[in-house]
Amino acid sequence: MTSKRKPRRRSLSPAKLDEMIEEATVDAYGESEQTVGFFTLLEERLKLPFKTEVLGVEVIVDRLDTTDDQQIVAVCSRGKSQQRVSILNLTLPDPPPEGAEWIEAFRRWARGR
């Protein structure tokens, strides 16, 4: 009996991620404006909603938002409950949603700041 697992999506090359970082941060001065650049691209390109898990519980990522201290968060819901989770810590489903490569690029940028 063979299992029909979908192949895992391969991570993008560092060079491709760097190109995406450049696209998100072009003409942005300072960390705050660069974060806004990423937020804008994530809103445009990340296909929402999608299901994932937070602390082992299935949730739906309904939208993105920013916090007062300029963090990008995913607004996750389960029933009537909502939780905001940093996009840096959000577990992505397998396969990831369309546009998830922008989360990967944002994470690379955030590690390098």
Language model features with spans:
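Mixed-charge, Lys/Arg-rich low-complexity intrinsically disordered regions
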Residues: 2-49
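Long, low-complexity intrinsically disordered regions
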Residues: 3, 24-27, 100-113
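A short beta-strand micro-motif
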Residues: 50-54
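Short beta-strand-centered aromatic/proline hotspots
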Residues: 57-65
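Beta-strand residues in well-ordered beta-sheet regions across diverse protein folds
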Residues: 62, 75-77
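Short aromatic-glycine-enriched beta-strand elements
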Residues: 68-75
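A short macromolecule-binding patch
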Residues: 81-90
